[in-house]
Every structure is written in structure tokens, then in C-alpha cells.
């Protein structure tokens, strides 16, 4: 049976799965029904979820949020800690929004990996999303959701590059282009509609930026002042909008590669155009006040959610070890012609290089003297990279890598230099690899056009020209990431790596 002939995931199909008693693992099946092909171990959402109120407005509808936040929301609702459902907002209507409509917001989450050295697989139909909206064409509906008293949480994942003011945004745009402008407008509407009474709301950003909630709060304040919004509104922002600093940790690969998608549908017994694959491991750390704790999933639903007084040690380990090594693996791996994280980490030379970068440069720079915990986490990370069940594309990891260099590598470089007094050569090789990737490969990056204009002015035979380019791009990466770095100390080493790679090749330079 081809995928096109399978029944599509929808509310009616979900009702049919319940009829077959799948949640109770009932053996009663009707063989002539196409649902008889569905496996009996799919975890179904409880019926109370489908009637739950919409309480969470989510800016972003990508695979990560669907494989992470929505999973925690469903677990909380099932566990009797109801937090409501999600209204998902994406920038414009496309094939994904059409699939959301066609599938009644439902999709399958497949978790595959190793736990205690043994393979595990879990399949869940996620019903956390009630509907999907387009910001470009349905902004009035997004605004209506923002002003509802029942809306208590706004979640976002616009990537690091999205946390920047839109230079041309105005308070009357429908909608503003930049995310801070969108959020400021939504919060202003909520404040105006309620006259500031009983309108408290939590903002839970999932971007991989240090103190992301605090940063977003400052951006909203800055945007409001730029728009000359009232002092009363600014006071309300400070008193009634509860920003959480967060750390998110789960490898979400997204949809299976096209050559494997048909087999997944056959195994499920139905067609799902929104299927998400991820690892079982999930950690969501929040540094937030009591309001966020009351209205967002907490540890009652899953041990993967932790509310803490200080998430710094979690963030340092995760961003510098997992995300930093991802950035290095992605850039070098793609330059070597590799396709997935597992291929990259299993490449003997590259795997050894990344392991050495973590153990000899990142962990020694770990603050607060928790090197043993960092070493344990690093071993877990490398094992997760080798997950045989996850096809984590290097292309997706490398998106917006020009900004990720600053947020993921600069802190470790800065800390290493402070503690050791020398530059971390492997991390700087990773910086050089990202620069080269942005010149030579097809990369989805907000700043790609500018960077390629900068590359076009480089004389490859001139060390001075290469150094000037490196200094210029590093300065831009400091600006984009808001992460300070000693440019004069690291630029010569990065430029030298670029020259050597051109003369000797990538592998020979990596070995030197």
C-alpha cells in the first residue's frame, strides 16, 4: 500500500484508533478497516485534551517546538495538571499550515534512542495544538488570541537571529516584521483590552541565548520606548508580564528523510505530513517566578521539566558542549561532504577532533568548578550524537550559523582565554570552518548576502586581506550575538586557518 492510499491523520482517524481500543492495548481489531494496520503501541491523547481551552500562544511552528514544548504540554494535560492547548503562529501560510488544517492540528511524535544502553521507541499522537495561524494573513486572529483572559502563556522560538528589533517596524504594522515588534504589539493589545486588570501573562522564550527572557524583556522595553508607548504601559510590562529564562535540551531531527518517510507511514498505518522524530532525552529548565510555575507544565508532569533559581550551570554545559559541538560538527561535516550528525561524529578524524575540543578546551573553561559534571554531560552528548535512530541533518544544524558562532562558541573561547591565557585552537578552527561554509555551501542564513559580499572582496593570496575579512566578520558576529570577544587575540589564528585550509586542505589543517 502506497502512502497516498493510507488514511490521513485527522480527528476522525484518532476517533477510529480509540474505537480499536489502542490506548488500552485492546486486541479487538477489525481486519478490513485500514486502521488495522496501525501498531497497537501508539500513545493516544486523552479526550480531555481535545476540549481543553486555548491558553498558550506560540510564535513558531517548527519541528523543535512540536517535538519539545508540545510534548511537555500533552504530558501535563494527561497527568492531570491541565495547562490547556496551543495556538501556533507561523509567519506565512505554506504546506505546513495546510497540513495542520488537514490533520486537525494532530501529528505523530516518534521518540527513538538508547536508554541505559538499550534501544527504545515511543510513538505518540500529539494533540496539543488546537489550530495554526499565519502572522502575515491572520494577524487579527493572533491579536484576538493575545487579548483573551484565558491566554496565560506566550512561547517563542524564532532562533537567535530573530531576537533583534526590526529597524522599519511601526506600532501600526499588521504585523511588524521583527519578533520583538510583534510581541510588543500583542502585549500592548492585551494591556489596552483589559485596562491592565487581571491581564498577567508569562513569556517563555526557547531561543538558545543566555538569559533569553531577560534579553527579550529588554528588547520589548526598547521597542515600546522607540514607539513612544505610554509610561503606564511600560509599568504594566514590568509588573504583569512574567519573562522566564530558559534552557531547552532535546535533539529534534524533524521529519524523516524522504526516502524513509513512506516506511514510517506504512508502520503507522496512516499518512502524517507533520511527523516529528526526536530522541527520548528531554530537559526543560526554567528560571521563573510563581506565575510561570502555575500556568506552564512543571515537574509533576515530567521529570524533564525543572524550575530552578539559577540555570547558569545548565546553560553553560548545554550551550557550550552540545550546541557548540553541533556548530563545529555541522560546519566541518558539511565541508567534508557528510550529511548527518551521526556520520560526522563517526568520522574518525572529525569525531576525535570534536571530542578533543570538548575535553581539552570547553570543559577546562567551565565555570563554577563543575568540570566532573561537565565531563559526564559531555559523554552523554557524544552518545546522543551517535543515536542510530535519529537522522539529524547537518543542513538544519547549520542554519543561521553566522549568529550561532557568537552565542555558542564565543563564551567558551572567552572563558578558555581568561583561564589559560592562550587561544583555544580547535574552537577557532571551528569558527574558520563556519566562515568557509558561508562562502562555499548552500546555507540558510539571515546574513548570508552580506557575508558573501564581504567574501567577494577577499584576495585569497593575501594574508592581510584575509585577516581584514576575518576581523570584519568577527565584529559583525559580536554585534549579531551580543557576545563580546577579544577580536585582536583570535582574528590572526582564524585567518591563518583559512589560509592553511586553502593551501593544504581541510583534513590536513584539522590534523595540524
Task: Identify the meaning behind each predicted range.
Residues 2-512:
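Substrate/ligand-engaging "lid" and interaction regions
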Amino acid at each position: 500500500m502506497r502512502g497516498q492510499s493510507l488514511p490521513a491523520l485527522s480527528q476522525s482517524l484518532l476517533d477510529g484508533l480509540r474505537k480499536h481500543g489502542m490506548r488500552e492495548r485492546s486486541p479487538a481489531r477489525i481486519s478490513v478497516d485500514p486502521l488495522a494496520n496501525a501498531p497497537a503501541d501508539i500513545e493516544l491523547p486523552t479526550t480531555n485534551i481535545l476540549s481543553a481551552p486555548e491558553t498558550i500562544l506560540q510564535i513558531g511552528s517548527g519541528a523543535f517546538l512540536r517535538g519539545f514544548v508540545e510534548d511537555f504540554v500533552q504530558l501535563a494535560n494527561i497527568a492531570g495538571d491541565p495547562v490547556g492547548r496551543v495556538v501556533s503562529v507561523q509567519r506565512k501560510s505554506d504546506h505546513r499550515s495546510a497540513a495542520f488544517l488537514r490533520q486537525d492540528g494532530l501529528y505523530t511524535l516518534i521518540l527513538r534512542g538508547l536508554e541505559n544502553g538499550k534501544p527504545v521507541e515511543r510513538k505518540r499522537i500529539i494533540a496539543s495544538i488546537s489550530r495554526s495561524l499565519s502572522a502575515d494573513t491572520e494577524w487579527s486572529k493572533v491579536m484576538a488570541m493575545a487579548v483573551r483572559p484565558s491566554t496565560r502563556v506566550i512561547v517563542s522560538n524564532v532562533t537567535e537571529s530573530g531576537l533583534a528589533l526590526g529597524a522599519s517596524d511601526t506600532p501600526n504594522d499588521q504585523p511588524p516584521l521583527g519578533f520583538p515588534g510583534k510581541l510588543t504589539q500583542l502585549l500592548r493589545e492585551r494591556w489596552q483590552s483589559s485596562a491592565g486588570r487581571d491581564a498577567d501573562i508569562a513569556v517563555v522564550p526557547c531561543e538558545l541565548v543566555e538569559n533569553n527572557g531577560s534579553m527579550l524583556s529588554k528588547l520589548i522595553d526598547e521597542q515600546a520606548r522607540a514607539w513612544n508607548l505610554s509610561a503606564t504601559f511600560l509599568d504594566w510590562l514590568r509588573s504583569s508580564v512574567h519573562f522566564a529564562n530558559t534552557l531547552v535540551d532535546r535533539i529534534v531531527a524533524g521529519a524523516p528523510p524522504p526516502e524513509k518517510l513512506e516506511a514510517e507511514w506504512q508502520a503507522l498505518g496512516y499518512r502524517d505530513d507533520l511527523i516529528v522524530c526526536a530522541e527520548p532525552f528531554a530537559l526543560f529548565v526554567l528560571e521563573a517566578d510563581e506565575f510561570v510555575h502555575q500556568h506552564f507544565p512543571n515537574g509533576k508532569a515530567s521529570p524533564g521539566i525543572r524550575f530552578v533559581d539559577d540555570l547558569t550551570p545548565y546553560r553553560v554545559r548545554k550551550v557550550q558542549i552540545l550546541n557548540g559541538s553541533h556548530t563545529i560538527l555541522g560546519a566541518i561535516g558539511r565541508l567534508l561532504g557528510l550529511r548527518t550528525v551521526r556520520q560526522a561524529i563517526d568520522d574518525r578524524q572529525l569525531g576525535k577532533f570534536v571530542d578533543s575540543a570538548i575535553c581539552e578546551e570547553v570543559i577546562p573553561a567551565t565555570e563554577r568548578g563543575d568540570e566532573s559534571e561537565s565531563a559526564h554531560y559531555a559523554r552523554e552528548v557524544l552518545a546522543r550524537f551517535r543515536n542510530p535512530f535519529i537522522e539529524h541533518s547537518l543542513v538544519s544544524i547549520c542554519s543561521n550559523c553566522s549568529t550561532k558562532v557568537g552565542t555558542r562558541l564565543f563564551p567558551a573561547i572567552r572563558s578558555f582565554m581568561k583561564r589559560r591565557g592562550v587561544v583555544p585552537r580547535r574552537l577557532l578552527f571551528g569558527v574558520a570552518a563556519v566562515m568557509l561554509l558561508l562562502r562555499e555551501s548552500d546555507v540558510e542564513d539571515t546574513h548570508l548576502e552580506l557575508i558573501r559580499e564581504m567574501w567577494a572582496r577577499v584576495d585569497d593570496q593575501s594574508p592581510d586581506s584575509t585577516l581584514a575579512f576575518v576581523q570584519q566578520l568577527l565584529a559583525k558576529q559580536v554585534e549579531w550575538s551580543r557576545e563580546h570577544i577579544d577580536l585582536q587575540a583570535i582574528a590572526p589564528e582564524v585567518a591563518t586557518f583559512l589560509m592553511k585550509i586553502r593551501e593544504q586542505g581541510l583534513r590536513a589543517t584539522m590534523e595540524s
